[in-house]
Amino acid sequence: MPGNTFGHSFRITTWGESHGRALGVVIDGVPAGLPLDTEIVQKELDRRRPGQSAVSTPRSETDKVEIISGIFEGKTTGTPISMMVWNKDADSSSYDNIKDLPRPGHADYPYMEKYGIRDHRGGGRSSARETIGRVAAGAVAKEILSIFGIDIIAHVTELGGIRAKEMPFDTIKEHLEKTPVRCADLEAAQLMLEKVGKAREEHESIGGVVEIIAIGLPPGIGEPVFDKLDADIAKAIMSIGAVKGVEIGIGNEAAQMKGSQMNDPFILEDGKIIAQTNNAGGILGGLSTGMPIICRASVKPTPSISKVQHTVNTKEMKNSDIIIKGRHDPTIPPRMVPVAEAMMALVLVDHMIRSGHIHPNSLLKQ
């Protein structure tokens, strides 16, 4: 199975399945000299782990990370970093009776068609638990970026049709973890919570929108044509399970605008060239402008719902019905927040290295 590696100069390979013994990641291209320990990585993993609130699956996993290689005396050595998390609370019993019934909205059917075999326990490799490796690697990327004044935050801006008000970066950062839905607009967050509760009562699920913002990126980061910064960001975010659409800046609204409305005029402020507006989302021609990078991801409702759905029994080759039991998230966006931040961080650190802003071998040579 190819396609498990992401990045160019800063590369990650994730491995493991939802109900396997463990999951993890190998990171290649981390410069030497970065102070790093398990506490830094664990902090990010704790943000994505299940069983923390009513808006997530009740599966109880501690997701304690072990750093296997690449660290000596508290600093990275420049060699590959390997990290792993043991699965402690995998319960496969609810999947055994549906192993021949492809779940609507899941990757079961195309996996079977492509490989002729699949791990039916919790979705195997296509499970959201695959993102453990992404978040662990993203924690490392975030640490590197912080040295250069780059900060990333993601938050839920829409859930079940409830939209949050726009807020400044600092307010989002302050309010983000005050509510289980990770929405900085606390009034909207309460309505979102009610929507989640209603969906759970109705054996349903709801989708939403996650916005990712990165500030502090210098202008000129990215590669033109096929390795454009926005193209790589879109690929990174689109690779997260359940994401069905990605927008950069004003996004789809650009199609209804005039050029005079869409263009971001440049002005000189304190000796620096900045844009008066940021419809472009901080990227022009595939290169950063120095303005905040803004990206939004449209996330579908959790496909695992406890309602009768039509499917096909692939063993008997006849139409059938399926009711999905087990422990599932009623909504995905709140738990996707740290995953989205991680993927943005991975793209940005990769391009910072490629552009020469970060030394590829050692931070001690900056």
Curated annotation (Swiss-Prot):
Cofactor: FMNH2
Pfam families: Chorismate_synt
Residues at which FMN binds: R125, S126, S127, G285, K300, P301, T302, P303, S304, R327
GO molecular function terms attached to this record: chorismate synthase activity; FMN binding
The protein's annotated pathway: Metabolic intermediate biosynthesis; chorismate biosynthesis; chorismate from D-erythrose 4-phosphate and phosphoenolpyruvate: step 7/7
Protein name, entry field: Chorismate synthase
Uppermost EC category: lyase
Cofactor binding description: Reduced FMN (FMNH(2)).
Keywords of this entry: Amino-acid biosynthesis, Aromatic amino acid biosynthesis, FAD, Flavoprotein, FMN, Lyase, NADP
Entry GO terms, CC: cytosol
Originating gene: aroC
